[in-house]
From Swiss-Prot:
Residues 27-37, 149-192 are lumenal. One of its GO terms (molecular function) is 1-acylglycerol-3-phosphate O-acyltransferase activity. GO terms for cellular component: endoplasmic reticulum; endoplasmic reticulum membrane. Belongs to the 1-acyl-sn-glycerol-3-phosphate acyltransferase family. The gene is AGPAT1. This is 1-acyl-sn-glycerol-3-phosphate acyltransferase alpha. The chain crosses the membrane at residues 38-58, 128-148. It comes from Ovis aries (Sheep). It is an enzyme of class 2 (transferase).
Amino acid sequence: MELWPGAGTLLLLLFLLLLLLLPTLWFCSPSAKYFFKMAFYNGWILFLAVLAIPVCAVRGRNVENMKILRLMLLHIKYLYGIRVEVRGAHHFPPSQPYVVVSNHQSSLDLLGMMEVLPGHCVPIAKRELLWAGSAGLACWLAGVIFIDRKRTGDAISVMSEVAQTLLTQDVRVWVFPEGTRNHNGSMLPFKRGAFHLAVQAQVPIVPIVMSSYQDFYCKKERRFTSGRCQVRVLPPVPTEGLKPDDVPALADRVRHSMLTVFREISTDGRGGGDYLKKPGGVGEAGL
């Protein structure tokens, strides 16, 4: 089939127009820049996962493959001009299993996680991630634990297996106890699965707090610039001797300590900036 006369010229003009339009949108529209950056962020992770899969497949499903993923993802913060400052890393217990609990703000949490991720540590993620193309397969090969949150019985069974794995294989797990991303600049109530897990295995809980991203990232405002994020590792919370009845108080105590630190590092000029001081940020009423 032949193209009508002038079709090639028209396609060339459309291509040139697109080349001119993209830079214009980039420099003149913060919203367009936000979508471009997020699209590249997700696409780049999927591409890196494609590269990681053959390397990880040599070992099969193995926690050690998380080191490969971490190595391949660490550079992303430089692409976006995000400086990640880690404090308190000495609080990680050196030679025992434990449960990490961290606040969950957006997919950018991956940058802070990779910066501070301890050895033999894998995240617990929602099962939907398993079907996220190359990223899902790479995560599976790295030993990420997937849970179907809609099926409570299955989730409890998986957590019981994880408790045994913690003790027998010296593995650490990373959990986002809020259960979902929280964009409002505070912390959602904690789900108790991670705390039941720690109490069942009688291993410590290591809280990790990432400062607010509001100075450089806001989904609602379609804003994504460069900035700094502080990741604070808090002292481990022991669970020896605790029973299931102690879990609610334990979860509340850990959340309170994390929220206090979150407010501190998100307003001191070294973390997420002064968002919490602004109208609409987290004040006493937001708690």
